[in-house]
Amino acid sequence: MSNRPNNNPGGSLRRSQRNTAGAQPQDDSIGGRSCSSSSAVIVPQPEDPDRANTSERQKTGQVPKKDNSRGVKRSASPDYNRTNSPSSAKKPKALQHTESPSETNKPHSKSKKRHLDQEQQLKSAQSPSTSKAHTRKSGATGGSRSQKRKRTESSCVKSGSGSESTGAEERSAKPTKLASKSATSAKAGCSTITDSSSAASTSSSSSAVASASSTVPPGARVKQGKDQNKARRSRSASSPSPRRSSREKEQSKTGGSSKFDWAARFSPKVSLPKTKLSLPGSSKSETSKPGPSGLQAKLASLRKSTKKRSESPPAELPSLRRSTRQKTTGSCASTSRRGSGLGKRGAAEARRQEKMADPESNQEAVNSSAARTDEAPQGAAGAVGMTTSGESESDDSEMGRLQALLEARGLPPHLFGPLGPRMSQLFHRTIGSGASSKAQQLLQGLQASDESQQLQAVIEMCQLLVMGNEETLGGFPVKSVVPALITLLQMEHNFDIMNHACRALTYMMEALPRSSAVVVDAIPVFLEKLQVIQCIDVAEQALTALEMLSRRHSKAILQAGGLADCLLYLEFFSINAQRNALAIAANCCQSITPDEFHFVADSLPLLTQRLTHQDKKSVESTCLCFARLVDNFQHEENLLQQVASKDLLTNVQQLLVVTPPILSSGMFIMVVRMFSLMCSNCPTLAVQLMKQNIAETLHFLLCGASNGSCQEQIDLVPRSPQELYELTSLICELMPCLPKEGIFAVDTMLKKGNAQNTDGAIWQWRDDRGLWHPYNRIDSRIIEQINEDTGTARAIQRKPNPLANSNTSGYSESKKDDARAQLMKEDPELAKSFIKTLFGVLYEVYSSSAGPAVRHKCLRAILRIIYFADAELLKDVLKNHAVSSHIASMLSSQDLKIVVGALQMAEILMQKLPDIFSVYFRREGVMHQVKHLAESESLLTSPPKACTNGSGSMGSTTSVSSGTATAATHAAADLGSPSLQHSRDDSLDLSPQGRLSDVLKRKRLPKRGPRRPKYSPPRDDDKVDNQAKSPTTTQSPKSSFLASLNPKTWGRLSTQSNSNNIEPARTAGGSGLARAASKDTISNNREKIKGWIKEQAHKFVERYFSSENMDGSNPALNVLQRLCAATEQLNLQVDGGAECLVEIRSIVSESDVSSFEIQHSGFVKQLLLYLTSKSEKDAVSREIRLKRFLHVFFSSPLPGEEPIGRVEPVGNAPLLALVHKMNNCLSQMEQFPVKVHDFPSGNGTGGSFSLNRGSQALKFFNTHQLKCQLQRHPDCANVKQWKGGPVKIDPLALVQAIERYLVVRGYGRVREDDEDSDDDGSDEEIDESLAAQFLNSGNVRHRLQFYIGEHLLPYNMTVYQAVRQFSIQAEDERESTDDESNPLGRAGIWTKTHTIWYKPVREDEESNKDCVGGKRGRAQTAPTKTSPRNAKKHDELWHDGVCPSVSNPLEVYLIPTPPENITFEDPSLDVILLLRVLHAISRYWYYLYDNAMCKEIIPTSEFINSKLTAKANRQLQDPLVIMTGNIPTWLTELGKTCPFFFPFDTRQMLFYVTAFDRDRAMQRLLDTNPEINQSDSQDSRVAPRLDRKKRTVNREELLKQAESVMQDLGSSRAMLEIQYENEVGTGLGPTLEFYALVSQELQRADLGLWRGEEVTLSNPKGSQEGTKYIQNLQGLFALPFGRTAKPAHIAKVKMKFRFLGKLMAKAIMDFRLVDLPLGLPFYKWMLRQETSLTSHDLFDIDPVVARSVYHLEDIVRQKKRLEQDKSQTKESLQYALETLTMNGCSVEDLGLDFTLPGFPNIELKKGGKDIPVTIHNLEEYLRLVIFWALNEGVSRQFDSFRDGFESVFPLSHLQYFYPEELDQLLCGSKADTWDAKTLMECCRPDHGYTHDSRAVKFLFEILSSFDNEQQRLFLQFVTGSPRLPVGGFRSLNPPLTIVRKTFESTENPDDFLPSVMTCVNYLKLPDYSSIEIMREKLLIAAREGQQSFHLS
């Protein structure tokens, strides 16, 4: 089971959208780079200045504005295709077909149709042989793709099957290929850099390239720069009479004809340059309806862009109503002047044609590859080549036309010589393919009169279709075959024929997705089969067909009454058919309107009951059904009540709490969102939920099963930000809405721009499917334009706005009484229990989440609760929470929303509980902050530098601008925070329709200051400005995309708060705040809100705190005064004794001193100095001060009073209290920014309910490239100069990809002479040997270095990061925008050309850089550690017995200033430093005493800061941050300098993200958060492209072969996979077992590596029998060598240690576990802490020796005491020393000599065998024993070990961990017993078992009784590794799955053993009859089933 990543088509198709300028589509996908889809495809741009000019201009969209034709008057947006990118082009091929048009309502008259038909004939008469090219694969996948192609207008000739269109193309396609791809990307088809080398190249990339996938492209088209514009203008001038068909008109308008009359176009009378050519055989969509629908298509195309589709029906169908609107995200209406045929109409046409492609012709548009969309057919024209015409008469004329076409463009005719025959051959081969003639024969068979003949034909038709695809079925006559099959389907008497006919239709839709438009006609017949079931097979097959149809044509099914029919006999069907039926139901509910409710009403009870079903897929479809209904009816209160009437709420509530959960994360989010929507729009449902005890449910979902009162410690269960967001939204909606007057009036401004007035009514227009859409300005203009052009009229209607009555503020208070408020009054008990249950939880969620979206929601919910709770209840609820300090920190936030909320909360609390809070607000600093706000002049405009990008201390990293910029951008639906408006009080900031599901689809805020003119005429822009709140507004695609990515548009509000006011112009372009709504609105709103804050703060102070004059008499100040006094005593110049420390201890541990008081007393800084200062002036030495501190806070002895025995102080409570207080201070003060892209996930009901978090942005990276100019560095002349012009580079490519690109083209060769003769012609000459080298090794010697400016770029940095960090142009942006405000950097990054210099690597530098981890100079690190020391020391040690003193690790930490590796600034820095010192003291205090017990005072876990952890986790879950390598510096620096702030798993993730390449980091992220991957990783770059190398090893020589594998692949970046000789198993299991077995082999006694005792294995297998292994209960440590050991033996042992280093590093790198029980001192060596090893560490190696050493050390201490005793005479001293004994023996009598205990041949110094140990040299002896055992004797082994390790990646990356944690990192979790509850939560029963199955319960019971050895056996059997990863079963990936092993009825399960699939952790368990038999069989299998992988 090889886990090889598939070459997923999605990944590859992606590139076609890459062309930044649209001028060079580089579709690697479509193959041109056949031999090497490389990881670096760089695109040089044209050299010819003229050509370059035009293409450049076109790229930037500055086409000379000659054409003012109305049709294309809109802005020229260059990157239409970009925005469109995530559309079909991106889908894996399989998916591309699932979209097909919905032709259900066809409101057009027959006469029109006839008219069109005639015209069609007329046209075909004119062009008798339109091209037969059938586009099928990605060549034009999706309308969007063809549009893009067209728009690029490159001279792109699509040849028949494209493989070698013209010489020129061939040549130009070549530079884009790179033989030396990294295998990784090769496999994944991921080209990272793209070539746009010349005009030809630009075309070829999109055309010639088509070959590899043998697309038959859509014909040929030619780019004619300006001339086209003229032509277009002239054509539109001669605008045809209105009588002409819309189609023709469109053509004349846009020049894109779909039935291209070639002869006429090219007759001599036509001046060629003027032509605007379209793809030749464009489809005849004449049969489709006239113009009107084009509008729909047009809008659709405009909005298409980010519409994500995926295959599974639920995830796929964004609702129809939505679809029309949400597409707005795409490019703006004003598509582009350059849009050639696609300007106004093209997009529409594209869509229309795809839809209608040639329905009538026998050749069938089916094969045209544009992915169908659900838009209505037909629309304003503008051709896109969905080719197909009947069998074309003359292929020669095809060729002739093609040739004429190319020559017209200026291609030399002589190129046609060699190509001609090939071309026609290709034409013939594909188009005249056998398939269509075979289909014609079968068609006759289907129409025969003889049933047996019909049956035979239909069976063969099935075979033809099931084996076919769009390529092989070119010209399949769908139009004729479908009616024939429908006829057969009605032969009620012949089940066989019906069944096969039904199958054929299903297969046809699979193979030719476009055929579904025709198959729609079969819906009534399919439904008949379900209404009266005569043959169950036919009925089930009909369901399958309907399910496929429902993905595109759900409306047709719904209106035919199909929903009820499908569910009619649901229970009779097999489970798969049931799933299909429910999927159909879900799809039918997708865009249902209130008028269609009656179609579903009767099925609701059945669906409701279905929620209790066990089948996961059924339940999910049912949930999807309800979620879509609620979404679509959200403003129809009566319908919502009907939907929720039959037990729906109860069933869903039960569904949410089922353990283990049935719902996936995405579904869970959707269901909770559905509840929120119901509650906000229908308060009676909220009341019903409250009565059903929803509070307990929510508490359970957030905190897990509660034991005891909820007031106690609240531990949240881990949930994704989306889940938290939805749950808090629901809590918020269950409470009544806040009023909208008084202090809440300001919310209106926070909610939306005041410019947005919600009218009482909205106007809507009807599209061709009869769906109504609200008007907005942009739509209106397009509609008007199209209606005019097509002579169409459209129905419009006026509809009361559901939102209007809730007033502009978006609250629903103006409605009649809120039922929730009634409930609060009528049932206070219920309200009370609700509030008590959830307040603490909400509070905890607020404190622990870092994403602004969640925090804003929480804040709303808390405000509602506080507002509606009465005083008594409040007192009760609040007593356990430090509300005041939270309010204080919220008031210092940079986010206006948070500040406003905090002021409102303070006001409510002071009104309700004045006596309590008047004291707390003073002590906790609330009053201080409020006064600050009241007095501040420039309120919040320029926060102090330190926190510019900081967050409010509640961690809201959002910042001021957020509140208002968003305030204004109301309906961009973001509200600056995804308050994904579905609640009334913070909601309804949706569009007039307020549909949740559209929200994300329209996240387009036009923004762009300085560059605006390029994209759109200013006047347009200004018009749009006021309209920016209109949800559907979009502006130039690129700008809007950037805007949408600006995290402000999600919940990460921009942090450069001030920029808005200070530099409007710059902000406009950069941070994306301006242009979001008219600037005035923004600044007005900001100013208004600031004004409100200031005024409110002022009133607050007046009202509550003006009475006292605060002369210090206030009791609230007592603690502060005491603390200040004590702090002053901590004076270093005067010895204040320990009294001040005692006072501080009592303040900290007994009083409730607040963080505010600690901050303001100066205590932190003073204590830090007291503990660390080491200056001459100090009155008392630092050591004494530290001991005093320990005495006071830890009751250790005072200086000078140490006892002789062990120092074992007890009582760490005061120190613990101090640490907690400091941590609280840190949480309140820190303002670390979090860069997250945190909008709540997708359209709740549109299907792709995925975690959309960074995927939008990732798509952006996939579709945009950086423009770089490669230049030889001025310092060097001995490499070639790059002459290829600027190149386009994938932003996520690594710098080494550029190196590879250049080196394999010969730019890495250093030349002696300076001939500059060779130019970039050499691109062709790729050096194959170099390419292969790059391909096969992870470790090629670097040849070139790269610089941006003066900065040397690390090879493993992404180009994007390099440009962003070092590019000079980036500097000037740094001030106004940083990652925090815009993760994609400023637009400038994407438009400027960045210069990257290259020069050869100097010889002397090479040696340092050879390592994968990109480490530099490792060569020095290891040896320097020992060698210089050794040189001098060896003599002293050997001759004189002098060993280096033990270093005190505490020294390093005792510094009052930040260490040099902390570079960030933050207000909390002093607190961090103090905590660092306190942690060091707690950890290493015993180094201050000779004889202290070696244990921590406070466990490290007590230092963890939950707020920083929440921020870190949030940061590390963001795919975009990881893909761009954009981890904030504070996180990596704190992780290494203060690891104690974060728990182990957070640091482990941080380690993987920073230590390795991006793909590994992503892999790790996906392993830990599988839901990120749910939707769209396959076609975006989220999916990591990890290369895998497979090796086969022989079990008999495992160690030897493992060494050679590590030698070859140890330092390779590929993942290593192992297979065993003569065994079939491959993949994860054998690989894990390999590491475990090699670990075991390394413990063999005969290798002589370890200290310990020899044992044999208890369960030996094969060669293990009779082998002795070393065991050491304390953990393994290297066996020491003496000075006299044999060099050969030493060399062998060093080799093994070097190998061990590589093995361990590789295991860490590949997420594998080793099974080596290493001792703690081993890990200290790994972390370079060997110099601080002491006698304490001997305990972890050899406890027996360690105990003796301890006793002897006591004797040494007594001896010192005696010697210091002044009263002793010489004689009495001598006597006293002789009486010192150990166990009654004097030292001399112990008979020790100077050799290492246990190793008589290792002398501790020269001649040590002959030196006896006496009382006088005892101290020297003990020092030498410790030094030799832990350092000297083992240093050579460890140096080799570290060398081996560092050849894979640098050891310095392990600084995130403490030595005792490395065991977890390397070997997984510690053994502990397994409990049945955990097993139940973490293991998945499947395929025949559920959690209630007897066998599963038996299994859990057996597993929970296993001892350690049995656990290891079981794990090794099931997973391949005897240890679980950290986190135990929870972290096992994939999870342990228990499936039922099936048998024949004659066989008895008790006779069989269980078997496993280790790759996916499947345990195949027979259903044994008793638990005893199961235990016995399991143990036999586990023991015997080791070490072999055969098929079970």
From Swiss-Prot:
Predominant location category:
nucleus
Question: Which residues lie in Low complexity bias regions?
Answer: 154-166, 175-216, 948-973, 1029-1040
Q: GO molecular-function annotation terms?
A: nuclear thyroid hormone receptor binding; ubiquitin protein ligase activity
The chain residues annotated with the modification Phosphothreonine are T1377
Residue stretches of biased makeup (Basic residues): 1001-1014
Q: Which GO terms describe its cellular component?
A: cytosol; nuclear speck; nucleoplasm; nucleus
- Biased-composition ranges, Polar residues, are 1-10, 18-27, 78-88, 119-132, 280-290, 326-338, 360-371, 803-812, 1041-1062
> Which residue intervals are annotated with compositional bias (Basic and acidic residues) in the record?
48-70, 346-358, 1017-1026
Cite the WWE domain residue spans from the record.
Answer: 749-836
Modification sites for N6-acetyllysine = K181, K1425
State the compartments where it is located. Nucleus, Nucleoplasm
Matching InterPro entries, A to Z?
Answer: ARM-like (IPR011989), ARM-type_fold (IPR016024), HECT_dom (IPR000569), Hect_E3_ubiquitin_ligase (IPR035983), HECTD1/TRIP12-like (IPR045322), WWE_dom (IPR004170), WWE_dom_sf (IPR037197)
Q: Which SMART domains match?
A: HECTc (SM00119)
Q: Where are the transmembrane segments?
A: none
Between which residues do disulfide bridges form?
Answer: none
| Function per UniProt | E3 ubiquitin-protein ligase involved in ubiquitin fusion degradation (UFD) pathway and regulation of DNA repair. Part of the ubiquitin fusion degradation (UFD) pathway, a process that mediates ubiquitination of protein at their N-terminus, regardless of the presence of lysine residues in target proteins.
How would you summarize the oligomeric state and partners of this protein?
Answer: Interacts with MYC; leading to disrupt interaction with isoform p19ARF/ARF of CDKN2A. Interacts with TRADD; leading to disrupt interaction with isoform p19ARF/ARF of CDKN2A. Interacts with SMARCC1; leading to disrupt interaction with SMARCE1.
| Entry similarity comment | Belongs to the UPL family. K-HECT subfamily.
Per the UniProt record, the associated disease is: Clark-Baraitser syndrome: An autosomal dominant disease characterized by intellectual disability, delayed psychomotor development, behavioral abnormalities, variable dysmorphic facial features, tall stature, obesity, and macrocephaly.
Q: Which PANTHER family match?
A: E3 UBIQUITIN-PROTEIN LIGASE TRIP12
Identify this protein by name: E3 ubiquitin-protein ligase TRIP12
Species in which this protein is naturally found: Homo sapiens
What taxonomic classification does the UniProt entry list for its organism? Eukaryota, Metazoa, Chordata, Craniata, Vertebrata
